[in-house]
Amino acid sequence: MPDSATQSDHQVAIVRTFDAPPEQVWEARVDPAQVAQWWGPDGLETPLESVVIELRQGGRYDLLMVDTRSGGESPVRQKILEVSAPELLVLRHEPMPQYGLVDPIVTRVEFHAHDGGTRLEVTGSPYTAELGPMAELGWGQQLDKLGRLLSA
């Protein structure tokens, strides 16, 4: 469950705390083997072989989500705009007109040390008014998966 989630002016913002240090949460966000274990909302999986992360400014952060029921595929193509390990990752998600996302989405992921763990702040924009709630739900579900991975 998110500590908090808001959507305003077509921005989605989620704050989550984890009982793991920022370095561990960072690794789970940038290591392909770990990303494949938690990326995607419920009902979607991310095959390890689809995860390509070039951890540098201008690098790629690409993967493929596969619907476990229908087999449908949703490619995620992102460019790394900013990286400062283990504190900040900024990505630009390529448009996905088939889902109603006609503009690039910029997602900012901040990792803050907090009470012996990590406070993770994720913000993304611009979302359409229709897609913002779905993005919030999807991010919440995949951060639940991340929490389970970090607790294992």
Short names for language-model regions:
Residues 70-77, 101-104:
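Short coil-to-beta-strand transition motifs
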Residues 25, 29, 35, 61, ...:
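Hydrophobic pocket/interface hotspot
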Residues 90-141:
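Beta-strand/loop substructures that line and gate deep hydrophobic ligand-binding cavities in soluble
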Residues 13-14, 33-73:
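Short beta-edge strand/loop motif at the mouth of beta-sheet-based domains
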